[in-house]
């Protein structure tokens, strides 16, 4: 769940899924509170898996309806919550690349002259992936 730090060929990466990081992603954070609350975890253990899967799907869809499309669209570089998270991390430590995927949007945002935030997008809608040679680039297939 927590982003992991990697040194690859002298470049420092912070890599993670990206869920729940930064000031946005309210729908995910709301859903996570429910699913990690001890009473609901206890209750969930007593449900038949078929019912548990249906409930999980129901709350996931309901969460998306509550959040609307705000969580699914690009908010601009100044409002993109994972970019804001990356900028905050840069105040603590230098990273060359931040790589996440939670937003499912292909994004490549230069944070400063030596740090870049890359959101990998997805292979279903955008056909995007990341490639690291001497630098990290977002590519399409």
Model-based region annotation:
Residues 1, 15-16, 97-102, 118-121:
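Active-site neighborhood of phospho(di)ester-bond hydrolases with catalytic His/Asp-centered motifs
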Residues 11-13, 97, 140:
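Structural motif
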Residues 21-23, 97-110, 126-127:
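Active-site environment of divalent metal-dependent phosphoester hydrolases
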Residues 1-92:
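Conserved catalytic scaffold of divalent metal-dependent phosphoesterases
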Residues 6-9, 106, 110-141:
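Binuclear metal-dependent phosphoesterase catalytic core
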């Amino acid at each position: 769940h927590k982003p992991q730090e990697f040194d690859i060929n002298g470049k420092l990466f912070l890599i993670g899924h990206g869920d729940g990081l930064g000031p946005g992603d309210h729908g995910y954070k709301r859903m996570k509170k429910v699913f990690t609350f001890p009473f609901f975890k206890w209750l969930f253990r007593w449900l038949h898996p078929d019912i548990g899967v249906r409930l999980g799907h129901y709350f996931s869809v309901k969460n998306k309806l509550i959040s609307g499309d705000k969580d699914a669209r690009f908010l601009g570089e100044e409002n993109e919550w994972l970019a804001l998270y990356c900028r905050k991390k840069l105040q603590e430590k230098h990273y060359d690349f931040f790589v996440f995927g939670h937003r499912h949007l292909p994004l490549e945002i230069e944070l400063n002259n030596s740090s870049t935030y890359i959101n990998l997008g997805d292979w279903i809608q955008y056909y995007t992936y990341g490639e690291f040679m001497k630098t990290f680039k977002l590519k399409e297939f």
